[in-house]
Amino acid sequence: MSEDLSMKCGLEIHVQVDTNSKLFCQCPTNYKDVEPNTNICPVCIGHPGAKPMPPNKKAIDMAIMVAKMLGCEMVIDKDIYFQRKHYNYPDLPSGYQKTSVPIGEHGTFLGVGITEVHLEEDPGQYKPDLGTVDYNRSGTPLIEIVTDPDMKSPEEAREFLRQLLRLFRYIGNLRGEGTMRADTNISIKYNGIQGNRVEVKNVNSIRGVYKVLKYELIRQKNVLRRGGEIKLETRAFMESQMITKGMRSKETADDYRYIPDPDLQPIVLSNDWVEKVEAQMPETPMNKEKRFVEQYGIKEDDAKVLVSDLELADVFEKVVAELGNDKDGISLAVTWIRNELKRVLVYNKIEFFETNLKPEHMVELINSIKDKTISQKIGKTIIEQMVEHKGEKTPKELISEMGLTVIEDTSELEKACEEAIKNSEKAIEDYKSGNQRALNSVVGQVMKLTRGRAEPGTVVEILKKKIDG
Ligand SMILES: [Zn+2]
């Protein structure tokens, strides 16, 4: 029997704003670096009667920027209330979470509708296995992005989150990697039967979201196939087992008994305010990719790789500017940044920003190759060393320390060539009988003997002279 299966997925994504102080008090937000329950005050641990301060300005600015970057319409000249969202959990001492009504609405990102963007406070951290709660995180500003249920496969949701995290890095001031959490909503239709929506709470990685969707797709399909019913419910993600488990039947908005927080003035955004934030907005990755192709005439694939990492893209532009913004300069920059540097980064599983390499380092290296101080092969070794030394040594220092400058002394080169010829009887024979390519292995030997410090062109010249006589 043929199967007709489709799914719809929507996400509620939470990301922390990198502010110094919390959303409604002046406690610091570096909760990961300090002893439990030290960054706390009556406001952020919800003492009755503790009066919150007006919301952190930077947090609001960042929420505006995220909403704008996601193409939202901003809520202008209207009261944006903070509401009390009531629920009972050990990480929430006041019994309610302060969460704003939308700051921006009706956006779109990668073809997925953005329902709304709003601001809220992070709760504390409850550790059920220890029975302890750490309130250091409580009150840290969070931006929540709610999408429409537009994603149709686990792969699409995964790509959406990857691109969103990349956007967070572009925007800056957000703690994307490491703090991103997503509530994942999924419903499926199987052979004409529509299941109810299931929510899986607090999935804290892209891989987790992907696994949840894969798992739920199969679980829900199996329930419907057996003639069962998909309940409207909230499930938990058991990360160690990569499965989901029923938690409770889904709350409706009524269960949270939302009321505007009487202790907090609503935010009112003006066009002026939004324009000021917009003036500081960075170029989006998509626009940068397009601009790279148009401005530098590089391949779309190369642009994609460079733009996937904001720092790498910046270095590329700075290096091109230094080398001369022409065909040669651009092609050198593509070779040594997009190909070679990227290869070393991927091999070491690190991002460019973790290497402490500076654009000047790349310019110095490329110039050394251009003026033939070092061979291309040595260039590759130096790049590996630059990454390994985390930018502490300049290419010039590494080249001289390792004694890797190109051999200028012809007698030294001739000696290496003679030795290589001596060791390559078969190849020389082949070459003499007309196989030009046989010479490559002899050149390779010379490179080995000189530890790559020979210029291949010069080597071929000397070899030919010696063999052809
Ligand atoms: Zn506090």
UniProtKB/Swiss-Prot annotation:
SMART domains, per database record: GatB_Yqey
Q: Which Pfam families match?
A: GatB_N, GatB_Yqey
UniProt-listed Enzyme Commission number(s): 6.3.5.-
Q: What class of enzyme is it?
A: ligase
- One BP term from GO: translation
Q: What are the entry keywords?
A: ATP-binding, Ligase, Nucleotide-binding, Protein biosynthesis
By sequence similarity, the record places it as follows: Belongs to the GatB/GatE family. GatB subfamily.
NCBIfam families, per the entry = gatB (TIGR00133), PRK05477.1-2 (NF004012), PRK05477.1-4 (NF004014)
What this protein is reported to do is described as: Allows the formation of correctly charged Asn-tRNA(Asn) or Gln-tRNA(Gln) through the transamidation of misacylated Asp-tRNA(Asn) or Glu-tRNA(Gln) in organisms which lack either or both of asparaginyl-tRNA or glutaminyl-tRNA synthetases. The reaction takes place in the presence of glutamine and ATP through an activated phospho-Asp-tRNA(Asn) or phospho-Glu-tRNA(Gln).
Q: What is this protein called?
A: Aspartyl/glutamyl-tRNA(Asn/Gln) amidotransferase subunit B
The organism's taxonomy opens as: Archaea, Methanobacteriati, Methanobacteriota, Methanomada group, Methanococci
